[in-house]
């Protein structure tokens, strides 16, 4: 999922790519994405939604089994004014995550 970016005119959503990024996300957003070890969970994908100025807005958890959004939370687990826009943008682009997952499964079989 490295390099996966989802965006529109207001938002840029990217996959958290390292343990350090999980720590930074959890610290800045004041939630448990780092301390609960989400980076260890191979059944979910964690992304960070930011505005065009680079300000973190929400952290998104996607199930890699169902391709549903499990949760999307702002600072201190709040919902933000961008919440619906983030959910809609993720759902419109979920096919990108499915496609990458499908390619990874094919490589594992080969």
Predicted segments with their positions:
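Catalytic-core elements of nucleic-acid end-processing and repair enzymes
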Residues: 1-110
